[in-house]
């Protein structure tokens, strides 16, 4: 089983496991520059590895320089290129520690509202994403990041009908335009931004149809049978399931979890 963590302001692992909580990337960068941040990131992930954690849902690639934005405190807090430089430097640190990293929240939060509590519409033009939001993701992918997490934002210039996590168009952008060949994972399907699009509980089916390889959810008892039924009916092609499983198994092999 893959285990997960979150770091800094993303903290999910119990603080009691560590002598002190890990500060956010912004705080570490302000205190010790990029070198200090990378050193602490390596140390933290080595501890996670010792605890049996093999996937860390970080780093945050979202570009935000406005403290009033929802995502700001969780972001690097710098412009697109500085954030991209951080991402390209930190991805190899995760690899060095033996803990896989997850670039998030594709295609970028910007100044959007919190999708934990409702729908977030992003009306910015695609040129803004090209010049800003996508740059850190491109940097992380080029550095070899094995996972990308897709947000629930509705990005109108990419797909105005569905949240990014449920959008085949957004996943095609990630695969074909950005050239990502690793594992795509959803943001939490229990978040309110998704519920309006899957009121019958079919979020996992929609997510797999969109192109996600892994699902973040707590509603397994309902969603697993729905996915199985969708495969049996042909609503989800078995060849697609095979492709998703292959990518997950490839990453498990890279982490030394299977031979």
Tell me the role of every PLM-derived stretch.
Residues 14-22, 54-73, 100, 104-121, ...:
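Active-site-proximal loop/short-helix segments
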Residues 19-32, 77:
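A charged helix-plus-loop insertion that forms the helical arch/lid used to bind
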Residues 43-56:
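Acidic-leg catalytic submotif of subtilisin-like serine proteases
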Residues 249, 253-259:
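A short C-terminal boundary segment appended to hydrolase-like catalytic domains
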């Amino acid at each position: 089983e893959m285990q997960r963590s979150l770091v800094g302001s993303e903290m999910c692992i119990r603080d009691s496991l560590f002598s002190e909580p890990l500060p956010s990337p912004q705080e570490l960068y302000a205190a010790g520059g990029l070198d200090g941040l990378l050193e602490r990131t390596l140390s933290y992930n080595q501890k996670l590895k010792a605890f049996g954690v093999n996937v860390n849902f970080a780093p945050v690639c979202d570009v935000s320089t406005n403290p009033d934005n929802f995502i700001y405190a969780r972001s690097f807090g710098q412009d697109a290129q500085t954030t991209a430089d951080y991402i390209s430097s930190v991805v190899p640190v995760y690899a060095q520690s033996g803990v896989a990293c997850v670039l998030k929240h594709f295609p970028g939060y910007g100044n959007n509202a919190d999708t934990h509590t409702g729908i977030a519409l992003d009306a910015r033009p695609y040129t803004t994403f090209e010049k800003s939001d996508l740059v850190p993701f491109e940097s992380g992918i080029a550095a070899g990041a094995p996972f990308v997490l897709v947000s629930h934002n509705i990005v109108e210039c990419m797909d105005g009908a569905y949240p990014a996590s449920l959008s085949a168009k957004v996943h095609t952008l990630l695969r074909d335009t950005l050239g990502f060949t690793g594992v795509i994972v959803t943001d939490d399907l229990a978040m309110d931004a998704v519920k309006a699009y899957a009121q019958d509980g079919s979020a996992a089916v929609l997510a797999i149809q969109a192109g996600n390889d892994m699902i973040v959810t707590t509603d397994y008892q309902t969603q697993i049978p729905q996915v199985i039924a969708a495969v049996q009916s042909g609503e989800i092609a078995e060849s697609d399931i095979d492709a998703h499983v292959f990518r997950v198994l490839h990453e498990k092999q890279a982490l030394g979890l299977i031979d």
